[in-house]
Amino acid sequence: MNIGQLIAERGKPFYSFEFFPPKDPDQWPDFFKMAERLAPLEPLFTSVTYGAGGSSQDATLEIVSHLKKEFQFETMAHLTCVGATQDYITQYLQRLRDNGVDNVLALRGDIPKGQDIDWETAEFRLSLIHISEPTRQAEI
């Protein structure tokens, strides 16, 4: 469900959680145990950050999908666009949709160390409307 709708319908204060996914998949079991302990607080939604330059992008997808399926959290995936191609962003949005993730927080993001970004050719990353349009059947 669209988080904006949830907030509007709620009409009172609520909790939300932002998770930074562990880089090491060996730490995921402890991470999910922590999420399980937080579940009784009934957050209105959870968000999962997204590493720039590929550092935790796939982890975000897996973790946000698991939180939605296992704990029935309404989830929002962060999407950092700096350094990503239009094709990659489109594919990532589709993968989120395929995993039932209806909410995305699209951010420019910080330039990863060692990368030089030409903002004139990267202008599309600042306005994702036309990129995400094909995947907008969900609330992305």
Where are the regions that the model predicts?
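Glycine-rich, proline-tolerant flexible connector loops at the mouths of alpha/beta enzymes
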Residues: 22, 44-61, 111-122
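Glycine-rich, positively charged N-terminal anion/phosphate-binding segment
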Residues: 1-5, 28-36, 53-73
